[in-house]
């Protein structure tokens, strides 16, 4: 089983890698086009709302609620009932999201006022940032339809994942990145406001993602006519699971939105610096954390469904799958966190310092990146640990934990006010760590999952190898002034060389410490 999980994880991570690489190219293009000034703040604000919704649906609450229920229908072996269930879910969900999308487009000034209070206050008082509020309202009208597209992308992706077709859903974000890069390069130069072109790119990217998945559903025989069925038993069950899951899974994203509200009161550039640092952190989070979480959820759901046939064995299989997921997060997340800590400024400089993005912006973004990075492992573990609840159709516990984490984040934000925008990143990292701890404590208390002794030994080996890697890379890394003086090709050479050195040292020390291939495959 774990060999199949590892293979699926590699497929998802491979597709995610392509998407994240294009995402970095997209961010490089955006940084060159609009830098980290007022235009960047407005566009990134308008982009954060649909981006939040993408994570909420495509990588979060909807899948967590839908997959376990779909697994029950699939276990019955009745394809016609499964198709009917999918049709009812798509029709009901589609109807609701259509209403929400239309209301949000019409009421975009209200949305902009809620999440950009600082700009709205300036608009009311004819302040210097009044134009930001007006532009944000316009861009939200263009970006909000992405919610409609991404809802069906999440639905079809979850269906395909349950039948082992993980690559389709993992590849679809590539289309969003291509659309945004294309509009930035070819449409933006023809418009007075380049951020308008980027907003159009988000709309087109959502449309392409939606159309891309249809042929795969049809081939699997699961493309069915949507039907409104609010009171259907299966739909009602998803609704009961999803409403709390919307909050529980997305606490970290809600915290980021709260950060955006506060950042709208801070100096120009704050939202942009937080965005670019968050984008670098999203690379390992998506490549490893979300990929592994996506792969193990259907397996965990099946183990839970099969508990009626063999309760004892299913519980063991469930626990082993959780432990395998945690070990994979440690294997990949620990060196990623240490690598980012050492190479934060060089990576920001190589990727973004051109055009309107200056060395000052590199320094500013690096501080928030270091702060966010302190919580990277927690952000990744949350994805795995939350599945331990949602696979068992327990959504109440994560909601309680989510409320605690969100309230704590607000308190941390207040305490971190003296640190300006960096304080927001510190607060997010602290609340994520609290969230992960409480999720684990709950699973352990219910005897669902305990961090095994084998995984503890594995963690110590990983930590030792990662520290050796980080120390050697830090010793060989040029100063930021030397990086700034290099040509672009020389910067690329040095960054690739240091990352290659890190990989060789990390893997070499792991082997010396006794880690072998079977440690990654077995869950027993």
Which residues does each PLM region occupy?
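Membrane-embedded alpha-helical bundles of multi-pass transporters/translocases
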Residues: 1-524
